Protein backbone atom coordinates (compact mmCIF):
# COMPACT_ATOMS: atom_id res chain seq x y z
CA UNK A 1 0.00 0.00 0.00
CA UNK A 2 1.28 3.50 -0.79
CA UNK A 3 2.55 5.76 1.97
CA UNK A 4 0.96 9.18 2.51
CA UNK A 5 4.05 10.73 0.94
CA UNK A 6 3.63 8.66 -2.21
CA UNK A 7 -0.08 9.44 -2.26
CA UNK A 8 0.62 13.17 -2.00
CA UNK A 9 3.17 12.93 -4.81
CA UNK A 10 0.69 11.07 -6.96
CA UNK A 11 -2.02 13.64 -6.28
CA UNK A 12 0.46 16.33 -7.24
CA UNK A 13 1.16 14.38 -10.41
CA UNK A 14 -2.53 14.52 -11.20
CA UNK A 15 -2.27 18.29 -11.18
CA UNK A 16 -5.39 18.74 -9.06
CA UNK A 17 -4.98 22.08 -7.39
CA UNK A 18 -6.21 23.31 -4.00
CA UNK A 19 -5.78 19.97 -2.22
CA UNK A 20 -8.89 18.72 -3.98
CA UNK A 21 -7.48 15.24 -4.36
CA UNK A 22 -9.37 14.01 -1.32
CA UNK A 23 -12.63 15.28 -2.78
CA UNK A 24 -11.90 13.81 -6.19
CA UNK A 25 -12.27 10.04 -6.02
CA UNK A 26 -10.32 9.13 -2.86
CA UNK A 27 -10.26 5.44 -3.96
CA UNK A 28 -8.31 6.50 -7.06
CA UNK A 29 -5.97 8.66 -4.98
CA UNK A 30 -5.10 5.66 -2.82
CA UNK A 31 -4.32 3.58 -5.92
CA UNK A 32 -2.25 6.15 -7.82
CA UNK A 33 1.12 4.61 -6.89
CA UNK A 34 0.09 1.49 -8.89
CA UNK A 35 -0.19 3.50 -12.08
CA UNK A 36 2.38 4.19 -14.78
CA UNK A 37 2.84 7.86 -15.80
CA UNK A 38 0.65 7.47 -18.91
CA UNK A 39 -2.10 5.90 -16.78
CA UNK A 40 -1.92 8.83 -14.34
CA UNK A 41 -2.49 11.13 -17.34
CA UNK A 42 -5.54 9.10 -18.37
CA UNK A 43 -6.86 9.24 -14.79
CA UNK A 44 -6.46 13.02 -14.85
CA UNK A 45 -8.33 13.17 -18.17
CA UNK A 46 -11.22 11.15 -16.73
CA UNK A 47 -11.43 13.27 -13.56
CA UNK A 48 -11.31 16.53 -15.48
CA UNK A 49 -14.25 15.26 -17.60
CA UNK A 50 -16.41 14.42 -14.59
CA UNK A 51 -15.84 10.67 -14.53
CA UNK A 52 -14.80 10.18 -10.86
CA UNK A 53 -17.69 7.70 -10.42
CA UNK A 54 -15.64 5.14 -12.36
CA UNK A 55 -13.33 4.77 -9.34
CA UNK A 56 -15.80 4.97 -6.44
CA UNK A 57 -15.82 1.21 -5.87
CA UNK A 58 -12.05 0.69 -6.14
CA UNK A 59 -10.64 -1.19 -3.12
CA UNK A 60 -7.25 -0.63 -1.44
CA UNK A 61 -4.05 -1.33 -3.40
CA UNK A 62 -3.31 -5.04 -3.32
CA UNK A 63 -6.91 -6.00 -4.19
CA UNK A 64 -7.79 -6.54 -7.87
CA UNK A 65 -4.66 -4.68 -9.00
CA UNK A 66 -4.56 -6.58 -12.33
CA UNK A 67 -8.18 -5.60 -13.02
CA UNK A 68 -7.34 -1.96 -12.28
CA UNK A 69 -4.49 -2.09 -14.80
CA UNK A 70 -6.80 -3.78 -17.34
CA UNK A 71 -9.22 -0.90 -16.82
CA UNK A 72 -6.55 1.57 -17.90
CA UNK A 73 -5.59 -0.64 -20.86
CA UNK A 74 -9.21 -0.30 -22.02
CA UNK A 75 -9.24 3.47 -21.39
CA UNK A 76 -6.02 3.75 -23.41
CA UNK A 77 -7.68 1.91 -26.35
CA UNK A 78 -10.81 4.05 -26.16
CA UNK A 79 -8.66 7.18 -26.05
CA UNK A 80 -6.44 6.27 -29.01
CA UNK A 81 -9.18 4.96 -31.32
CA UNK A 82 -11.36 8.09 -31.30
CA UNK A 83 -10.32 11.22 -33.24
CA UNK A 84 -9.35 13.79 -30.58
CA UNK A 85 -9.35 11.18 -27.82
CA UNK A 86 -11.75 10.30 -25.02
CA UNK A 87 -12.07 13.90 -23.79
CA UNK A 88 -13.43 14.89 -27.23
CA UNK A 89 -15.84 11.95 -27.13
CA UNK A 90 -17.23 12.99 -23.73
CA UNK A 91 -17.48 16.67 -24.73
CA UNK A 92 -19.24 15.80 -28.01
CA UNK A 93 -21.58 13.52 -26.08
CA UNK A 94 -22.52 16.26 -23.60
CA UNK A 95 -23.41 18.63 -26.41
CA UNK A 96 -25.42 16.06 -28.39
CA UNK A 97 -27.23 14.81 -25.27
CA UNK A 98 -28.14 18.40 -24.32
CA UNK A 99 -29.45 18.99 -27.86
CA UNK A 100 -31.45 15.75 -27.67
CA UNK A 101 -32.98 16.66 -24.30
CA UNK A 102 -33.89 20.12 -25.61
CA UNK A 103 -35.47 18.55 -28.71
CA UNK A 104 -33.14 20.54 -30.97
CA UNK A 105 -33.65 19.85 -34.67
CA UNK A 106 -30.31 19.29 -36.45
CA UNK A 107 -31.87 20.79 -39.58
CA UNK A 108 -32.98 24.09 -38.01
CA UNK A 109 -32.18 26.93 -40.39
CA UNK A 110 -31.82 24.62 -43.40
CA UNK A 111 -34.07 24.53 -46.47
CA UNK A 112 -34.13 21.37 -48.60
CA UNK A 113 -33.93 21.30 -52.39
CA UNK A 114 -33.25 18.67 -55.03
CA UNK A 115 -29.50 18.30 -55.70
CA UNK A 116 -27.97 17.80 -59.13
CA UNK A 117 -27.08 14.32 -60.26
CA UNK A 118 -27.25 11.81 -63.08
CA UNK A 119 -30.25 9.57 -63.74
CA UNK A 120 -29.24 6.56 -65.84
CA UNK A 121 -31.36 4.26 -68.00
CA UNK A 122 -30.02 0.72 -68.19
CA UNK A 123 -28.83 -0.33 -71.62
CA UNK A 124 -29.10 2.97 -73.51
CA UNK A 125 -26.11 4.51 -75.33
CA UNK A 126 -25.27 6.84 -72.43
CA UNK A 127 -25.31 3.95 -69.95
CA UNK A 128 -23.10 1.78 -72.17
CA UNK A 129 -20.53 4.56 -72.68
CA UNK A 130 -20.46 5.35 -68.93
CA UNK A 131 -19.91 1.65 -68.14
CA UNK A 132 -16.94 1.58 -70.52
CA UNK A 133 -15.54 4.78 -68.96
CA UNK A 134 -15.93 3.19 -65.52
CA UNK A 135 -14.08 0.02 -66.49
CA UNK A 136 -11.24 2.19 -67.82
CA UNK A 137 -11.08 4.02 -64.44
CA UNK A 138 -11.27 0.83 -62.35
CA UNK A 139 -7.51 0.29 -62.35
CA UNK A 140 -7.22 3.65 -60.55
CA UNK A 141 -9.70 2.63 -57.83
CA UNK A 142 -9.62 1.05 -54.38
CA UNK A 143 -12.60 -0.71 -52.79
CA UNK A 144 -13.67 -0.52 -49.15
CA UNK A 145 -16.25 -2.90 -47.68
CA UNK A 146 -17.75 -2.08 -44.29
CA UNK A 147 -18.47 -5.47 -42.74
CA UNK A 148 -18.69 -5.02 -38.99
CA UNK A 149 -22.03 -6.77 -38.51
CA UNK A 150 -23.17 -10.28 -37.71
CA UNK A 151 -26.26 -11.72 -39.34
CA UNK A 152 -28.30 -11.97 -36.12
CA UNK A 153 -30.94 -9.53 -37.39
CA UNK A 154 -31.38 -11.89 -40.36
CA UNK A 155 -31.75 -15.00 -38.23
CA UNK A 156 -28.22 -16.13 -39.14
CA UNK A 157 -25.46 -16.55 -36.56
CA UNK A 158 -22.46 -16.11 -38.84
CA UNK A 159 -20.96 -13.02 -40.46
CA UNK A 160 -23.14 -11.48 -43.14
CA UNK A 161 -20.51 -11.66 -45.91
CA UNK A 162 -20.39 -15.46 -45.48
CA UNK A 163 -24.08 -15.80 -46.38
CA UNK A 164 -24.78 -17.28 -49.83
CA UNK A 165 -25.64 -14.45 -52.23
CA UNK A 166 -27.79 -17.00 -54.05
CA UNK A 167 -28.20 -20.73 -53.59
CA UNK A 168 -28.03 -21.86 -57.23
CA UNK A 169 -24.23 -21.74 -56.94
CA UNK A 170 -23.99 -21.18 -53.16
CA UNK A 171 -21.32 -18.49 -53.59
CA UNK A 172 -21.18 -16.15 -50.62
CA UNK A 173 -21.32 -12.36 -50.80
CA UNK A 174 -17.59 -11.97 -50.14
CA UNK A 175 -16.67 -14.35 -52.97
CA UNK A 176 -18.92 -12.43 -55.37
CA UNK A 177 -17.41 -9.08 -54.33
CA UNK A 178 -13.84 -10.33 -54.76
CA UNK A 179 -14.59 -11.98 -58.13
CA UNK A 180 -16.23 -8.72 -59.28
CA UNK A 181 -13.19 -6.64 -58.28
CA UNK A 182 -10.87 -9.12 -60.01
CA UNK A 183 -13.04 -8.98 -63.16
CA UNK A 184 -12.84 -5.17 -63.13
CA UNK A 185 -9.08 -5.38 -62.61
CA UNK A 186 -8.64 -7.72 -65.58
CA UNK A 187 -10.96 -5.76 -67.90
CA UNK A 188 -9.39 -2.42 -66.96
CA UNK A 189 -5.85 -3.70 -67.50
CA UNK A 190 -6.77 -4.96 -70.98
CA UNK A 191 -7.46 -1.36 -72.00
CA UNK A 192 -3.86 -0.32 -71.27
CA UNK A 193 -1.23 -0.50 -73.96
CA UNK A 194 1.72 -2.56 -72.85
CA UNK A 195 2.04 -4.43 -69.58
CA UNK A 196 -0.40 -3.70 -66.75
CA UNK A 197 0.28 -5.21 -63.33
CA UNK A 198 -2.37 -3.25 -61.44
CA UNK A 199 -3.77 -4.96 -58.37
CA UNK A 200 -6.89 -3.18 -57.12
CA UNK A 201 -6.66 -2.78 -53.32
CA UNK A 202 -9.52 -4.14 -51.24
CA UNK A 203 -10.09 -3.02 -47.64
CA UNK A 204 -12.51 -4.77 -45.30
CA UNK A 205 -13.53 -2.97 -42.13
CA UNK A 206 -14.32 -5.54 -39.46
CA UNK A 207 -15.26 -5.37 -35.78
CA UNK A 208 -14.55 -7.51 -32.72
CA UNK A 209 -17.63 -9.50 -33.74
CA UNK A 210 -16.55 -10.22 -37.31
CA UNK A 211 -12.75 -9.95 -37.51
CA UNK A 212 -11.64 -13.53 -36.78
CA UNK A 213 -14.46 -15.05 -38.86
CA UNK A 214 -13.69 -12.76 -41.82
CA UNK A 215 -9.99 -13.69 -41.76
CA UNK A 216 -10.89 -17.38 -41.49
CA UNK A 217 -13.31 -17.13 -44.45
CA UNK A 218 -10.61 -15.51 -46.59
CA UNK A 219 -7.77 -17.84 -45.58
CA UNK A 220 -9.79 -21.05 -45.88
CA UNK A 221 -10.82 -20.07 -49.43
CA UNK A 222 -7.41 -18.81 -50.65
CA UNK A 223 -8.82 -15.26 -50.65
CA UNK A 224 -11.24 -16.33 -53.41
CA UNK A 225 -8.50 -15.84 -56.01
CA UNK A 226 -7.24 -12.45 -54.86
CA UNK A 227 -3.63 -12.03 -53.80
CA UNK A 228 -3.48 -11.77 -49.98
CA UNK A 229 -1.35 -8.62 -50.32
CA UNK A 230 -4.29 -6.87 -52.04
CA UNK A 231 -6.54 -7.33 -49.01
CA UNK A 232 -6.25 -5.07 -45.97
CA UNK A 233 -8.31 -5.68 -42.84
CA UNK A 234 -9.00 -2.66 -40.61
CA UNK A 235 -10.74 -3.44 -37.32
CA UNK A 236 -12.93 -0.80 -35.73
CA UNK A 237 -13.08 -0.41 -31.96
CA UNK A 238 -16.26 0.18 -30.02
CA UNK A 239 -16.99 3.41 -28.11
CA UNK A 240 -17.86 4.04 -24.47
CA UNK A 241 -21.50 3.90 -23.40
CA UNK A 242 -23.11 6.89 -21.71
CA UNK A 243 -25.17 6.44 -18.54
CA UNK A 244 -26.88 9.83 -18.31
CA UNK A 245 -27.29 13.34 -19.74
CA UNK A 246 -24.02 14.42 -18.09
CA UNK A 247 -22.19 11.93 -20.33
CA UNK A 248 -21.00 9.89 -17.37
CA UNK A 249 -19.45 6.74 -18.82
CA UNK A 250 -21.35 3.54 -18.03
CA UNK A 251 -19.65 0.62 -16.32
CA UNK A 252 -20.22 -2.88 -17.63
CA UNK A 253 -23.03 -4.43 -15.54
CA UNK A 254 -20.99 -7.65 -15.30
CA UNK A 255 -17.57 -6.13 -14.57
CA UNK A 256 -17.07 -3.00 -12.48
CA UNK A 257 -13.52 -2.61 -13.85
CA UNK A 258 -14.72 -2.32 -17.43
CA UNK A 259 -16.44 0.51 -19.29
CA UNK A 260 -19.47 -0.71 -21.22
CA UNK A 261 -18.96 -0.31 -24.97
CA UNK A 262 -21.11 -0.53 -28.11
CA UNK A 263 -20.43 -0.12 -31.84
CA UNK A 264 -19.91 3.44 -33.09
CA UNK A 265 -21.25 2.75 -36.59
CA UNK A 266 -19.74 2.36 -40.06
CA UNK A 267 -18.67 6.02 -40.15
CA UNK A 268 -15.52 4.83 -38.37
CA UNK A 269 -14.19 3.67 -41.72
CA UNK A 270 -12.95 7.19 -42.53
CA UNK A 271 -10.88 7.54 -39.34
CA UNK A 272 -9.46 4.03 -39.81
CA UNK A 273 -8.41 4.80 -43.39
CA UNK A 274 -6.86 8.08 -42.25
CA UNK A 275 -4.79 6.45 -39.50
CA UNK A 276 -3.83 3.39 -41.59
CA UNK A 277 -1.63 5.31 -44.05
CA UNK A 278 -3.23 3.43 -46.95
CA UNK A 279 -4.57 6.57 -48.65
CA UNK A 280 -1.07 8.05 -49.09
CA UNK A 281 0.14 4.71 -50.42
CA UNK A 282 -2.75 4.52 -52.90
CA UNK A 283 -2.34 8.08 -54.12
CA UNK A 284 1.38 7.56 -54.70
CA UNK A 285 0.59 4.55 -56.93
CA UNK A 286 -1.92 6.45 -59.08
CA UNK A 287 -5.21 5.67 -57.36
CA UNK A 288 -7.90 8.29 -58.02
CA UNK A 289 -11.05 6.80 -56.49
CA UNK A 290 -12.14 5.13 -53.26
CA UNK A 291 -15.39 3.13 -53.51
CA UNK A 292 -17.27 2.32 -50.29
CA UNK A 293 -19.97 -0.32 -50.06
CA UNK A 294 -21.93 -2.32 -47.49
CA UNK A 295 -22.03 -6.00 -46.81
CA UNK A 296 -25.16 -7.59 -48.30
CA UNK A 297 -26.35 -5.98 -51.53
CA UNK A 298 -26.01 -8.72 -54.12
CA UNK A 299 -26.62 -6.38 -57.07
CA UNK A 300 -24.23 -3.56 -56.23
CA UNK A 301 -21.50 -4.42 -58.75
CA UNK A 302 -24.08 -4.02 -61.54
CA UNK A 303 -24.03 -0.32 -60.64
CA UNK A 304 -20.33 0.27 -60.11
CA UNK A 305 -18.94 0.55 -63.68
CA UNK A 306 -21.48 3.18 -64.80
CA UNK A 307 -21.34 5.11 -61.50
CA UNK A 308 -17.54 5.22 -61.65
CA UNK A 309 -17.92 6.46 -65.22
CA UNK A 310 -20.16 9.27 -63.93
CA UNK A 311 -17.58 10.26 -61.28
CA UNK A 312 -14.84 10.41 -63.90
CA UNK A 313 -16.80 12.29 -66.58
CA UNK A 314 -18.55 14.72 -64.20
CA UNK A 315 -15.55 15.28 -61.92
CA UNK A 316 -17.54 14.51 -58.75
CA UNK A 317 -15.53 14.65 -55.50
CA UNK A 318 -18.38 12.68 -53.91
CA UNK A 319 -20.82 10.48 -55.84
CA UNK A 320 -23.62 8.76 -53.91
CA UNK A 321 -25.26 5.82 -55.62
CA UNK A 322 -29.03 6.01 -55.44
CA UNK A 323 -32.25 4.40 -56.64
CA UNK A 324 -35.64 5.93 -57.45
CA UNK A 325 -37.50 6.33 -54.16
CA UNK A 326 -41.22 6.44 -53.47
CA UNK A 327 -42.30 9.31 -51.20
CA UNK A 328 -42.11 8.32 -47.51
CA UNK A 329 -40.40 5.01 -48.39
CA UNK A 330 -38.20 3.86 -45.48
CA UNK A 331 -34.90 4.79 -47.14
CA UNK A 332 -32.96 8.04 -46.74
CA UNK A 333 -33.25 10.68 -49.47
CA UNK A 334 -30.27 12.52 -50.98
CA UNK A 335 -30.98 16.19 -50.39
CA UNK A 336 -29.33 19.57 -50.89
CA UNK A 337 -29.58 21.65 -47.71
CA UNK A 338 -29.07 25.43 -47.73
CA UNK A 339 -28.70 27.24 -44.41
CA UNK A 340 -29.93 30.78 -43.77
CA UNK A 341 -26.26 31.75 -43.32
CA UNK A 342 -25.48 30.58 -46.87
CA UNK A 343 -23.88 27.21 -46.06
CA UNK A 344 -24.87 24.34 -48.35
CA UNK A 345 -24.37 20.59 -48.28
CA UNK A 346 -25.60 17.56 -50.18
CA UNK A 347 -26.29 14.73 -47.76
CA UNK A 348 -28.51 11.80 -46.93
CA UNK A 349 -31.56 12.85 -44.87
CA UNK A 350 -33.34 9.96 -43.16
CA UNK A 351 -36.87 9.38 -44.45
CA UNK A 352 -38.49 10.15 -41.07
CA UNK A 353 -36.73 13.55 -41.01
CA UNK A 354 -37.20 14.49 -44.68
CA UNK A 355 -41.00 14.73 -44.64
CA UNK A 356 -41.24 17.06 -41.58
CA UNK A 357 -38.32 19.13 -42.90
CA UNK A 358 -40.12 19.71 -46.21
CA UNK A 359 -43.42 20.56 -44.47
CA UNK A 360 -41.63 23.04 -42.20
CA UNK A 361 -40.02 24.86 -45.14
CA UNK A 362 -42.96 25.70 -47.37
CA UNK A 363 -43.79 22.32 -48.93
CA UNK A 364 -47.29 21.57 -47.55
CA UNK A 365 -47.39 18.08 -49.10
CA UNK A 366 -44.06 17.14 -47.55
CA UNK A 367 -42.26 14.24 -49.19
CA UNK A 368 -44.53 13.68 -52.21
CA UNK A 369 -44.10 11.88 -55.53
CA UNK A 370 -43.54 14.11 -58.57
CA UNK A 371 -44.72 13.53 -62.15
CA UNK A 372 -42.30 10.58 -62.51
CA UNK A 373 -44.24 8.67 -59.84
CA UNK A 374 -41.24 8.90 -57.50
CA UNK A 375 -39.99 11.38 -54.90
CA UNK A 376 -37.60 13.95 -56.42
CA UNK A 377 -35.22 13.03 -53.57
CA UNK A 378 -33.49 9.82 -54.70
CA UNK A 379 -32.99 6.92 -52.29
CA UNK A 380 -29.52 6.58 -50.80
CA UNK A 381 -28.15 3.02 -50.97
CA UNK A 382 -24.94 3.65 -49.02
CA UNK A 383 -22.47 3.22 -51.81
CA UNK A 384 -20.07 6.13 -52.17
CA UNK A 385 -17.38 6.98 -54.69
CA UNK A 386 -14.89 9.55 -53.39
CA UNK A 387 -12.13 11.25 -55.36
CA UNK A 388 -8.98 10.47 -53.41
CA UNK A 389 -7.23 13.88 -53.55
CA UNK A 390 -10.05 15.99 -52.06
CA UNK A 391 -10.85 13.11 -49.68
CA UNK A 392 -7.33 13.15 -48.26
CA UNK A 393 -7.40 16.95 -47.92
CA UNK A 394 -10.62 16.74 -45.92
CA UNK A 395 -9.26 13.98 -43.68
CA UNK A 396 -6.18 16.09 -42.94
CA UNK A 397 -8.59 18.59 -41.34
CA UNK A 398 -10.97 16.16 -39.62
CA UNK A 399 -8.71 13.11 -39.01
CA UNK A 400 -11.68 11.10 -40.20
CA UNK A 401 -14.12 12.35 -37.56
CA UNK A 402 -17.68 12.14 -38.91
CA UNK A 403 -20.70 14.12 -37.77
CA UNK A 404 -22.27 12.09 -34.95
CA UNK A 405 -25.71 11.63 -33.47
CA UNK A 406 -27.11 10.16 -30.27
CA UNK A 407 -30.38 8.28 -29.86
CA UNK A 408 -31.13 7.78 -26.14
CA UNK A 409 -34.25 5.91 -25.09
CA UNK A 410 -35.65 8.02 -22.23
CA UNK A 411 -37.66 6.58 -19.32
CA UNK A 412 -40.28 9.35 -19.58
CA UNK A 413 -41.11 12.72 -21.16
CA UNK A 414 -38.87 14.66 -18.74
CA UNK A 415 -35.89 13.19 -20.64
CA UNK A 416 -33.84 13.04 -17.43
CA UNK A 417 -33.02 9.31 -17.36
CA UNK A 418 -32.30 6.60 -19.92
CA UNK A 419 -33.93 3.16 -20.11
CA UNK A 420 -30.47 1.78 -20.88
CA UNK A 421 -27.08 3.25 -21.69
CA UNK A 422 -26.61 4.97 -25.04
CA UNK A 423 -23.58 5.96 -27.15
CA UNK A 424 -22.59 8.26 -29.98
CA UNK A 425 -22.97 6.88 -33.49
CA UNK A 426 -21.79 7.90 -36.94
CA UNK A 427 -22.55 6.84 -40.50
CA UNK A 428 -20.24 6.46 -43.47
CA UNK A 429 -22.58 8.45 -45.74
CA UNK A 430 -22.45 11.55 -43.48
CA UNK A 431 -18.91 12.30 -44.70
CA UNK A 432 -20.11 15.21 -46.94
CA UNK A 433 -21.51 17.14 -43.94
CA UNK A 434 -18.15 18.80 -43.27
CA UNK A 435 -17.27 19.58 -46.90
CA UNK A 436 -16.92 23.17 -48.17
CA UNK A 437 -19.61 24.49 -50.56
CA UNK A 438 -17.06 24.33 -53.40
CA UNK A 439 -16.99 20.50 -53.21
CA UNK A 440 -18.55 18.78 -56.21
CA UNK A 441 -21.10 16.47 -54.61
CA UNK A 442 -23.53 14.59 -56.83
CA UNK A 443 -25.42 11.36 -57.18
CA UNK A 444 -26.05 8.61 -59.71
CA UNK A 445 -29.52 7.06 -59.89
CA UNK A 446 -30.27 3.74 -61.49
CA UNK A 447 -33.19 1.35 -61.26
CA UNK A 448 -33.52 -0.63 -58.03
CA UNK A 449 -34.06 -3.87 -60.00
CA UNK A 450 -30.53 -3.49 -61.35
CA UNK A 451 -28.62 -2.11 -58.37
CA UNK A 452 -30.29 -2.61 -55.00
CA UNK A 453 -31.41 -5.75 -53.19
CA UNK A 454 -30.11 -5.55 -49.61
CA UNK A 455 -30.46 -8.50 -47.25
CA UNK A 456 -31.17 -7.10 -43.79
CA UNK A 457 -34.54 -8.34 -42.46
CA UNK A 458 -35.37 -11.68 -40.86
CA UNK A 459 -38.37 -13.71 -42.13
CA UNK A 460 -40.75 -12.54 -39.36
CA UNK A 461 -40.02 -8.85 -39.93
CA UNK A 462 -40.06 -9.20 -43.73
CA UNK A 463 -43.49 -10.88 -43.63
CA UNK A 464 -44.87 -7.80 -41.81
CA UNK A 465 -43.74 -5.38 -44.55
CA UNK A 466 -46.80 -3.79 -46.24
CA UNK A 467 -47.58 -5.33 -49.62
CA UNK A 468 -45.81 -3.54 -52.44
CA UNK A 469 -42.89 -2.40 -50.28
CA UNK A 470 -39.51 -4.15 -50.59
CA UNK A 471 -38.89 -7.01 -48.13
CA UNK A 472 -35.09 -6.61 -48.02
CA UNK A 473 -34.76 -10.23 -46.87
CA UNK A 474 -32.68 -13.24 -47.91
CA UNK A 475 -35.73 -14.39 -49.92
CA UNK A 476 -36.20 -11.15 -51.87
CA UNK A 477 -32.43 -10.63 -52.18
CA UNK A 478 -31.91 -13.92 -53.99
CA UNK A 479 -34.99 -13.60 -56.19
CA UNK A 480 -33.85 -10.07 -57.15
CA UNK A 481 -30.61 -11.49 -58.56
CA UNK A 482 -32.53 -13.86 -60.86
CA UNK A 483 -34.85 -11.04 -61.88
CA UNK A 484 -31.96 -8.69 -62.71
CA UNK A 485 -30.07 -11.33 -64.70
CA UNK A 486 -33.24 -12.32 -66.58
CA UNK A 487 -34.00 -8.69 -67.46
CA UNK A 488 -30.40 -8.07 -68.56
CA UNK A 489 -30.54 -11.10 -70.90
CA UNK A 490 -33.93 -9.93 -72.17
CA UNK A 491 -32.48 -6.51 -72.95
CA UNK A 492 -29.64 -8.28 -74.79
CA UNK A 493 -32.23 -9.96 -77.02
CA UNK A 494 -32.83 -13.37 -75.44
CA UNK A 495 -36.37 -14.62 -74.87
CA UNK A 496 -36.69 -15.06 -71.11
CA UNK A 497 -40.01 -16.35 -69.78
CA UNK A 498 -42.13 -14.23 -67.45
CA UNK A 499 -41.94 -15.01 -63.74
CA UNK A 500 -44.52 -16.78 -61.61
CA UNK A 501 -45.62 -15.47 -58.23
CA UNK A 502 -44.93 -17.62 -55.16
CA UNK A 503 -44.85 -17.08 -51.40
CA UNK A 504 -41.90 -18.06 -49.19
CA UNK A 505 -41.76 -17.29 -45.45
CA UNK A 506 -44.89 -15.17 -45.85
CA UNK A 507 -43.36 -13.03 -48.62
CA UNK A 508 -44.92 -12.87 -52.09
CA UNK A 509 -42.14 -12.68 -54.70
CA UNK A 510 -41.59 -13.03 -58.44
CA UNK A 511 -39.77 -16.23 -59.34
CA UNK A 512 -37.78 -15.76 -62.56
CA UNK A 513 -35.57 -18.37 -64.23
CA UNK A 514 -32.58 -19.02 -61.95
CA UNK A 515 -29.89 -17.43 -64.12
CA UNK A 516 -26.41 -16.69 -62.74
CA UNK A 517 -23.01 -15.95 -64.24
CA UNK A 518 -19.52 -15.21 -63.02
CA UNK A 519 -18.53 -11.51 -63.11
CA UNK A 520 -15.84 -12.18 -65.77
CA UNK A 521 -18.58 -13.31 -68.18
CA UNK A 522 -20.93 -10.34 -67.91
CA UNK A 523 -19.16 -7.45 -66.18
CA UNK A 524 -20.94 -4.77 -68.23
CA UNK A 525 -23.93 -4.80 -70.58
CA UNK A 526 -21.72 -4.60 -73.69
CA UNK A 527 -20.10 -7.93 -72.66
CA UNK A 528 -23.48 -9.62 -72.24
CA UNK A 529 -24.79 -8.27 -75.53
CA UNK A 530 -21.74 -9.61 -77.38
CA UNK A 531 -22.24 -13.12 -75.94
CA UNK A 532 -26.02 -13.56 -76.13
CA UNK A 533 -27.85 -13.82 -79.41
CA UNK A 534 -31.51 -13.07 -79.98
CA UNK A 535 -32.53 -16.54 -81.08
CA UNK A 536 -32.16 -18.05 -77.57
CA UNK A 537 -34.87 -18.80 -75.01
CA UNK A 538 -35.06 -19.86 -71.35
CA UNK A 539 -38.25 -21.19 -69.74
CA UNK A 540 -39.48 -20.04 -66.32
CA UNK A 541 -38.67 -23.33 -64.56
CA UNK A 542 -35.10 -23.33 -65.88
CA UNK A 543 -31.77 -22.69 -64.21
CA UNK A 544 -28.75 -21.50 -66.22
CA UNK A 545 -25.30 -21.25 -64.60
CA UNK A 546 -22.49 -19.70 -66.67
CA UNK A 547 -19.00 -20.41 -65.26
CA UNK A 548 -16.59 -19.21 -67.90
CA UNK A 549 -15.50 -15.97 -69.49
CA UNK A 550 -15.80 -16.86 -73.18
CA UNK A 551 -19.08 -18.74 -73.31
CA UNK A 552 -21.52 -17.57 -75.98
CA UNK A 553 -25.21 -18.42 -76.20
CA UNK A 554 -26.63 -18.83 -79.68
CA UNK A 555 -29.75 -20.70 -80.69
CA UNK A 556 -30.20 -22.17 -77.20
CA UNK A 557 -33.64 -23.36 -76.14
CA UNK A 558 -33.43 -24.28 -72.45
CA UNK A 559 -36.17 -26.01 -70.47
CA UNK A 560 -34.49 -27.48 -67.40
CA UNK A 561 -31.12 -26.96 -65.70
CA UNK A 562 -27.87 -26.26 -67.56
CA UNK A 563 -24.47 -25.63 -65.96
CA UNK A 564 -21.66 -24.60 -68.31
CA UNK A 565 -18.07 -24.63 -67.02
CA UNK A 566 -15.21 -23.38 -69.20
CA UNK A 567 -11.66 -23.00 -67.91
CA UNK A 568 -9.83 -19.68 -68.22
CA UNK A 569 -9.81 -18.56 -71.86
CA UNK A 570 -11.58 -21.65 -73.30
CA UNK A 571 -14.22 -20.59 -75.84
CA UNK A 572 -17.51 -22.41 -76.17
CA UNK A 573 -20.84 -21.77 -77.88
CA UNK A 574 -23.96 -23.11 -76.14
CA UNK A 575 -26.64 -24.01 -78.65
CA UNK A 576 -29.52 -26.41 -79.38
CA UNK A 577 -32.58 -27.61 -77.48
CA UNK A 578 -31.84 -28.76 -73.94
CA UNK A 579 -34.63 -30.26 -71.87
CA UNK A 580 -34.47 -32.14 -68.56
CA UNK A 581 -36.39 -32.44 -65.30
CA UNK A 582 -34.26 -29.65 -63.84
CA UNK A 583 -34.29 -28.36 -60.28
CA UNK A 584 -37.57 -27.89 -58.49
CA UNK A 585 -38.13 -25.32 -55.76
CA UNK A 586 -39.10 -26.76 -52.41
CA UNK A 587 -40.72 -24.60 -49.70
CA UNK A 588 -38.94 -24.53 -46.32
CA UNK A 589 -40.43 -23.14 -43.11
CA UNK A 590 -38.11 -20.69 -41.36
CA UNK A 591 -38.79 -22.53 -38.08
CA UNK A 592 -37.70 -25.91 -39.49
CA UNK A 593 -34.51 -26.55 -37.49
CA UNK A 594 -33.66 -29.61 -39.62
CA UNK A 595 -32.52 -27.16 -42.33
CA UNK A 596 -29.44 -24.91 -42.21
CA UNK A 597 -30.00 -21.30 -41.13
CA UNK A 598 -28.99 -19.92 -44.53
CA UNK A 599 -31.76 -22.02 -46.15
CA UNK A 600 -34.40 -21.39 -43.47
CA UNK A 601 -34.13 -17.61 -43.77
CA UNK A 602 -34.88 -17.91 -47.52
CA UNK A 603 -37.89 -20.17 -47.19
CA UNK A 604 -36.90 -22.38 -50.12
CA UNK A 605 -34.29 -24.80 -51.39
CA UNK A 606 -33.59 -26.49 -54.71
CA UNK A 607 -34.38 -30.13 -55.23
CA UNK A 608 -31.75 -31.03 -57.85
CA UNK A 609 -33.68 -33.66 -59.81
CA UNK A 610 -31.80 -33.52 -63.13
CA UNK A 611 -29.29 -31.28 -64.86
CA UNK A 612 -26.91 -31.13 -67.80
CA UNK A 613 -23.38 -30.06 -66.90
CA UNK A 614 -20.97 -29.17 -69.72
CA UNK A 615 -17.23 -28.86 -68.99
CA UNK A 616 -14.66 -27.30 -71.34
From Swiss-Prot:
State its cofactor: Mg(2+); Mn(2+)
> What Gene Ontology terms describe what this protein does at the molecular function level?
UDP-N-acetylglucosamine diphosphorylase activity; UTP-monosaccharide-1-phosphate uridylyltransferase activity
Q: Which reaction does it catalyse?
A: a monosaccharide 1-phosphate + UTP + H(+) = a UDP-monosaccharide + diphosphate
Could you tell me the EC number(s) of this protein? 2.7.7.64
Q: Which InterPro entries match?
A: Nucleotide-diphossugar_trans, UDP-sugar_pyrophosphorylase, UDPGP_fam
Keywords in alphabetical order, please: Nucleotidyltransferase, Transferase
Which Gene3D superfamilies does the annotation name?
A: 2.160.10.30, Spore Coat Polysaccharide Biosynthesis Protein SpsA, Chain A (3.90.550.10)
Q: One GO biological process from the UniProt record?
A: UDP-N-acetylglucosamine biosynthetic process
> Into which family does the record put it?
Belongs to the USP family.
Known role: May function as the terminal enzyme of the myo-inositol oxidation (MIO) pathway. May also play a role in the salvage pathway for synthesis of nucleotide sugars.
Q: What is this protein called?
A: UDP-sugar pyrophosphorylase
Q: What organism is this sequence from?
A: Oryza sativa subsp. indica
Lineage of the organism: Eukaryota, Viridiplantae, Streptophyta, Embryophyta, Tracheophyta
